C-alpha cells in the first residue's frame, strides 16, 4: 500500500497550488484502494500549454488515435481527458509510446496515463434479492391532500419515514418527514445527482422526477446513465438510492421518496473495472448549476486497512463545487460514511472525512448502530438503514426492471435519505449555502433513541452544549425541524482557515504510555484569518508504526472536548508507510472557541509490543470570526440553537 498522503484539505492556497500543478499523478499517495501491482488505464490527462477549445483538443486526440472525452472541471481549457481507442482498459505497465506521441505535439505540455483504482458500493447484498413486482393502489388519482399519509403500497414498510414500531422498531424513531411535508415542503425545484452505477430512469416511480439535462454516463461517455443489467442484480444500487430521494407519491407504485417532488439526475460512473481521477472529477463537477446535491454511496474499500481518498482533479472539482456551484451558494456533497464496521475508521476515508462533504452514518429501527457502521470524528449526522429484528426490514425503494425492494441497506441507504432531507431544506430556503446546510444539520439533528449496541461510544457534550456521539455525529436528521429553521435562517458569516501551529520534531511513541503534544494558539487573532467560532478542525499528521492499525490518536480542544481522530483498526498491518500529512478531521468541537492549548495524544492499543514515531503535527482551524447565530431568534429556550447562542453570548460578555 502506498503512503497515505494528502494535504488537500488544509487551506485554499494549498488547493490553488494543486490546481495549478494539475491533476495528473494522484494525490501523492495512497493507492491503497488497489490490490496487487499498479494498474494503468487507457485514459490520459493531456495538459495543453494554453487554453484550447474542444474542437482543437478533438483534432489532437484524433491525430494520435485517441477520443477526446472533454475538458476537466476547473482547468480553464488547459486539461482534457483523452481515451485511447485500442489500448486495453487496464494493464500493468505504462504505455510510453502513446505518452511520447501526445507530448510530441507542440501545443501539449504534458500527458499522463491515468492509474486505475478501486471504488466500492456501500451496501450489503442479501443472498437472495427480495425483488417484488409493482403493487397498485386503488386510491391512485384521488388527489390526496398533503396532510394525509401517502397511499403508496410500500409506505407502511418505510419505517424510516414513519416509525410506528414495525418489526420491533422504536416508535417515532424516524426522519420526521411528515412534519416537513405538512408545511408544503416536498423538494420542489431541487435536483439531487445519484453518482453511482446508473439510474433506471424509465422506472414508473422515477421517470416523472428524472432530470435528463443534468444526467450523464461517464462510464460509457453518453447522456444515458442507464444501468448495465447483470445476472446478480449488482447494478441496482443507484436505482435504489434514487428511489429513496425522489420516488413519486400516491401513484400506487413502490414507496415514496423523502423529497418526492424533487428531481433526480443519474451520473453513471461506478460501472467499469477501475476508477480514474478523471472520471471522479468530471462526475463531481457535472452541471454544478443544475444540480444542487450530489449523493455518493461508495468510497475506498472498507477492509479496515485501506487509507485512501480523492486524487487531485477530484479534489479540485469538489472545492470548485462548494465555492462556485449553485451560482455561488455551493453544491452539497453527501457521503456514506462506510461499511467497515468496528474494524475500520472513516477518518481513513478521505471522501467521508473531508470538510467539504457531509458524512452520514446509519442507525437501525430500534436505535442502535448497524453492525457494519464505522465510527469516526468526521461524521456529521445519521439517518437509517436496515431494521434490527427482520433482515428483510431494510429500506423499501425502487429496483431494476420497474420493480421494488425492501432489502436496500448499508450506509449506502443512509446517504440518499440525508440528500432527500437537504432537498427539503433547499426548497424551504433556496438561498442556503453549503455551510448553512452543515450548520442546520448540527443544530436540528436529534439524539433521539440512538445508542451504541456494544457500549463503546457514549453521548458527550462539547464546550458549547452540543451533544455528539463518535458513531452518530450530532444525531439523526429531523426533516421537520430542519425545514422550520431553514425558513428563518440567515446565512452564516464568512469562513476562515487558520493555520494555528505545528510541531515538527519527531518523537517516539512508547508502548504502554501515551505521547502528548501540545499547541497553544490564539487562533490567528488580529489577522485576516481570525477564527473565534469553530466548524471543522484538522490535525494534519505524519506518523509511522510497526503496526499502523494499533495506533490510536486523540485530539482535545481548549474547552476540553476529546475527539478520537483515529481508532484501532485490527486489519491494518501496515508497517512501512504510516501516515504522511494525513488530515484527520473532527466536527465534535463545532461552535467552540479555539483559543488556548490543543492536545494531541498518540498511543498503541495492542497486547503485543509496538513502536513508532509521531513525526509532525499541524493544527488547522476552520470557522468564523463573528458569532454564526447572532441574527437568529430561537423558537425554544431548550433548542440547540438557543443553547449554543447563549454560550456564545456568555463568552462574549466575559
UniProtKB/Swiss-Prot annotation:
This is Neuroendocrine convertase 2. Its EC number is 3.4.21.94. GO terms for cellular component: extracellular region; extracellular space; membrane; neuron projection. CDD domains: Peptidases_S8_Protein_convertases_Kexins_Furin-like (cd04059). It catalyses: Release of protein hormones and neuropeptides from their precursors, generally by hydrolysis of -Lys-Arg-|- bonds. The active site is at residues 196, 237, 412. Serine endopeptidase which is involved in the processing of hormone and other protein precursors at sites comprised of pairs of basic amino acid residues. Required during embryonic and larval development, probably by proteolytically processing peptide hormones involved in hatching, larval growth and larval molting. Required for the processing and activation of Akh which maintains normal hemolymph sugar levels. Residues 1-21 form the signal peptide. Expressed in the central nervous system (CNS) and midgut endocrine cells of third instar larva (at protein level). In the CNS, expressed in the CA-LP1 and CA-LP2 neurons which innervate the corpus allatum, and in the CC-MS2 neurons which innervate the corpora cardiaca of the ring gland. Also expressed in the CC-MS1, SP3, Tv and Va neurons. Expressed in Akh-producing cells of the corpora cardiaca. In the embryo, restricted to the final stages of embryogenesis where expression is found in anterior sensory structures and in only 168 cells in the brain and ventral nerve cord. Glycans are attached at residues 189, 312, 544. GO terms for molecular function: peptidase activity; serine hydrolase activity; serine-type endopeptidase activity. It is found in: Secreted. Disruption phenotype: RNAi-mediated knockdown in Akh-producing cells of the corpora cardiaca results in a significant decrease in combined glucose and trehalose levels. RNAi-mediated knockdown results in defective muscle patterning. RNAi-mediated knockdown results in a reduction in the pale ommatidia subtype. Its main location: secreted. Pfam families: P_proprotein, Peptidase_S8, S8_pro-domain. Keywords: Cleavage on pair of basic residues, Disulfide bond, Glycoprotein, Hydrolase, Protease, Secreted, Serine protease, Signal, Zymogen. Disulfide bonds join 254-404, 346-376, 498-524. One of its GO terms (biological process) is R8 cell fate specification. Residues 158-483 form the Peptidase S8 domain. Residues 491-627 form the P/Homo B domain. Belongs to the peptidase S8 family. Furin subfamily. The gene is amon. The keyword Transferase does not apply. Residues 22-121 form a propeptide. InterPro entries: Galactose-bd-like_sf, Kexin/furin, P_dom, Peptidase_S8/S53_dom, Peptidase_S8/S53_dom_sf, Peptidase_S8_Asp-AS, Peptidase_S8_His-AS, Peptidase_S8_Ser-AS.
Amino acid at each position: 500500500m502506498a503512503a497515505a498522503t494528502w494535504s488537500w484539505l488544509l487551506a485554499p492556497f494549498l488547493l490553488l497550488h494543486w490546481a495549478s500543478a494539475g491533476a495528473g499523478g494522484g494525490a501523492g499517495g495512497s493507492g491503497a484502494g488497489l490490490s496487487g501491482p499498479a494498474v494503468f488505464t487507457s485514459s490520459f490527462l493531456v495538459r495543453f500549454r494554453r487554453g484550447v477549445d474542444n474542437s482543437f483538443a478533438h483534432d489532437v486526440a484524433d491525430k494520435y488515435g485517441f477520443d477526446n472525452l472533454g475538458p476537466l472541471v476547473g482547468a480553464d481549457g488547459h486539461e482534457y481527458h483523452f481515451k485511447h481507442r485500442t489500448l486495453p482498459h487496464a494493464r500493468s505497465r505504462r504505455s510510453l509510446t502513446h505518452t511520447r506521441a501526445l507530448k510530441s505535439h507542440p501545443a501539449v505540455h504534458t500527458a499522463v496515463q491515468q492509474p486505475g483504482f478501486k471504488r466500492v458500493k456501500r451496501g450489503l447484498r442479501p443472498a437472495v434479492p427480495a425483488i417484488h413486482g409493482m403493487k397498485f393502489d386503488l386510491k391512485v388519482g384521488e388527489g390526496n391532500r398533503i396532510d394525509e399519509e401517502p397511499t403508496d403500497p410500500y409506505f407502511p414498510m418505510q419505517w424510516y419515514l414513519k416509525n410506528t414500531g414495525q418489526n420491533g422498531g422504536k416508535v417515532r424513531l424516524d426522519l420526521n418527514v411528515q412534519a416537513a411535508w405538512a408545511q408544503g415542503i416536498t423538494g420542489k425545484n431541487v435536483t439531487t445527482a445519484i453518482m453511482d452505477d446508473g439510474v433506471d430512469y424509465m422506472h414508473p416511480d422515477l421517470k416523472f422526477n428524472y432530470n435528463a439535462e443534468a444526467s450523464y454516463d461517464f462510464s460509457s461517455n453518453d447522456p444515458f446513465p442507464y444501468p448495465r443489467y447483470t445476472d446478480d442484480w449488482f447494478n441496482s444500487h443507484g436505482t435504489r438510492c434514487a428511489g429513496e430521494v425522489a420516488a413519486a407519491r400516491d401513484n400506487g407504485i413502490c414507496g415514496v421518496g423523502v423529497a418526492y417532488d424533487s428531481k433526480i439526475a443519474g451520473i453513471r460512473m461506478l460501472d467499469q473495472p477501475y476508477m480514474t481521477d478523471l472520471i471522479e472529477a468530471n462526475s463531481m463537477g457535472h452541471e454544478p448549476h443544475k444540480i444542487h446535491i450530489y449523493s455518493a454511496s461508495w468510497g475506498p474499500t472498507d477492509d479496515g486497512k485501506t487509507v485512501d481518498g480523492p486524487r487531485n482533479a477530484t479534489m479540485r472539482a469538489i472545492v470548485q463545487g462548494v465555492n462556485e456551484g449553485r451560482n455561488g451558494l455551493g453544491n452539497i456533497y453527501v457521503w456514506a460514511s462506510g461499511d467497515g464496521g468496528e474494524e475500520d475508521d472513516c477518518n481513513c476515508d478521505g471522501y467521508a472525512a473531508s470538510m467539504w462533504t457531509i458524512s452520514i452514518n446509519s442507525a437501525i429501527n430500534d436505535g442502535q448502530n448497524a453492525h457494519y457502521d464505522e465510527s469516526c470524528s468526521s461524521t456529521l449526522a445519521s439517518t437509517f438503514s436496515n431494521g434490527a429484528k427482520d433482515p428483510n426490514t431494510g429500506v423499501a425503494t425502487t429496483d431494476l426492471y420497474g420493480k421494488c425492494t425492501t432489502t436496500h441497506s448499508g450506509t449506502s441507504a443512509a446517504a440518499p435519505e440525508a440528500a432527500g432531507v437537504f432537498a427539503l431544506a433547499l426548497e424551504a430556503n433556496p438561498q442556503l449555502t453549503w455551510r448553512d446546510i452543515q450548520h442546520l444539520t448540527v443544530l436540528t439533528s436529534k439524539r433521539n433513541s440512538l445508542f451504541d449496541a456494544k457500549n463503546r461510544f457514549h453521548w458527550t457534550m462539547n464546550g458549547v452544549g452540543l451533544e455528539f456521539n463518535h458513531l452518530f455525529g450530532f444525531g439523526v436528521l429531523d426533516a421537520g425541524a430542519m425545514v422550520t429553521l431553514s425558513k428563518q435562517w440567515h446565512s452564516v458569516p464568512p469562513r476562515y482557515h487558520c493555520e494555528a501551529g505545528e510541531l515538527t520534531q519527531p518523537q517516539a511513541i512508547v508502548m504502554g504510555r501515551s505521547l502528548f503534544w501540545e499547541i497553544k494558539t490564539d487562533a490567528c487573532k488580529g489577522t485576516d484569518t481570525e477564527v473565534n467560532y469553530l466548524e471543522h478542525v484538522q490535525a494534519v499528521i505524519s506518523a509511522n508504526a510497526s503496526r499502523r492499525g494499533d495506533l490510536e490518536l486523540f485530539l482535545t480542544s481548549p474547552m476540553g472536548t476529546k475527539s478520537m481522530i483515529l481508532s484501532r483498526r485490527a486489519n491494518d498491518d501496515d508497517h512501512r508507510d504510516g501516515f504522511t500529512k494525513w488530515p484527520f478531521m473532527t466536527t465534535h468541537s463545532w461552535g467552540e472557541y479555539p483559543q488556548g492549548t490543543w492536545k494531541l495524544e498518540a498511543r498503541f492499543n495492542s497486547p503485543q509490543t509496538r513502536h513508532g514515531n509521531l513525526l509532525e503535527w499541524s493544527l488547522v482551524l476552520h470557522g468564523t470570526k463573528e458569532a454564526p447565530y447572532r441574527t437568529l431568534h430561537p423558537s425554544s429556550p431548550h433548542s440547540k440553537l438557543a443553547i449554543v447562542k447563549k454560550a456564545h453570548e456568555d463568552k462574549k460578555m466575559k
